[in-house]
Every structure is written in structure tokens, then in C-alpha cells.
């Protein structure tokens, strides 16, 4: 099983990053996609992906950091994307929930990254929160020019999920679905996601599954907990966990064009 969303550059992993990766593979995880959320972290993610086996990375600017987007950023992302470890542009998209960057700054950076991905023939790794309508409006003209797209950490509605799937977008599911309160609506959507469009992720160190036992004293999520998320998703979809793992691995290879 492959974790498509690990924030391995996080300071929460600074002291034991080697152990985090070792535990993940010991738990049965067979690959990690390390998320880049701004230029500096994208550069760090690429170096980590080169350092660890069976790891890849993304290069891009998260909507929270969109105010940093400028011509030099674009040039650096394009240069970084040429590295073999970098297999997607992102994390890019819109987040109108907190607006750490203005909506205008977010839209400018999102469209710029869609253009880069199209020009480089690379998939996009996307984020959307409280911005679905505008997100789809900006994304749609680019979809036919992109080799693929995933909306990571999906927490939206049934209608939003169906709108994404209808456009060929992959859906990334995290341990959010394990939350006995916030995850209930998402849990009900799991059987409706086509198997060929489903991907799994931890978004570590964030979104520790709330039903994990025993809970780590640090309250920190890590990719070694991906098997727990996989088991829960399989349970709520009514399918075999091993089969689901194989299916999502195939989806990863198809979307990102990698072998593991």
C-alpha cells in the first residue's frame, strides 16, 4: 500500500525522520509521496525522496502560501520538476476556509501551477477547502491538457465527490474518515467512489486516526498507520483490504507513472 500524502518535511519529524520511514516500510507500506507545500519545502521534499528508497515527491505551492508566488518561484518549481523524484505539481489549489493568502493570490498561483503541469505533462496534486465551485471552474479548462489529477485529503460532499470523479479526478482519502463525528459523511461516500479513482494517504503528521488504539502519546500521525486507514476504508466499502491495497497501488502507478 502506497501513502500518497506524507508531510515528511514537517518539523514534527525532524528528530526521528529515519525511524518514521523505517516504521512505515516495516508496517507494510511500499512507497511514500512526500508533499511539497512551498518552494523551500518542495526542495527539501525532493532531497528526502532522493535519500530514501521507494519515495517520490511533489513540487508546488499550497494555497496558504500563495502570496509567495512570483516569477522566480515559477522558475524554481519548473527546475525542480525536472528531477526524477518529482512526479507531480502541487500541493496546489484553493482554501477559502482560512484565507492565509487572499483568494486572488490563491487563484493566481493555482492557475499558474496548472499551466506548469500541462506544459510539463505532469499530474497535479491538489487541495480544496470551502472553495469547490471556484476550484472546478478554474481547473476544468486544464483537465484535458493534464495527464492526471488527484484531490488529496478529500472531505467534501457527495455532490463534490461526484463532480470530481465525473471529471476523471482521483480522490485521496485520509484518516479523517476514522473520526466518529467529522468523518461520518465521508464514510458514507466511500462505497460510491469508483475503485479505479481511489487513493489512500495519511497526511502525516496531521489527521491521526481517532479510532487508532493504542493512541501514540505524541498524538502525531505517521505513515506506519496507513494499514489502519486501509483496513477501515475496506471495511466501510465492504471489500477485502488486500484487494483494495492492490487496486490503490495500481492507481498510484497509473497516475504518477512510477514503479515500486
From Swiss-Prot:
GO terms for molecular function: 3'-5'-RNA exonuclease activity; magnesium ion binding; single-stranded DNA 3'-5' DNA exonuclease activity. The keyword Endoplasmic reticulum does not apply. This is 3'-5' ssDNA/RNA exonuclease TatD. The lineage of its organism: Bacteria, Pseudomonadati, Pseudomonadota, Gammaproteobacteria, Enterobacterales. Coiled coil: none annotated. Monomer. Its cofactor is Mg(2+). HAMAP family: TatD_exonuclease. It comes from Escherichia fergusonii (strain ATCC 35469 / DSM 13698 / CCUG 18766 / IAM 14443 / JCM 21226 / LMG 7866 / NBRC 102419 / NCTC 12128 / CDC 0568-73). InterPro entries: DNase_TatD-rel_CS (IPR018228), Exonuc_TatD (IPR024918), Metal_Hydrolase (IPR032466), TatD-like (IPR001130), TatD-type_Hydrolase (IPR050891).
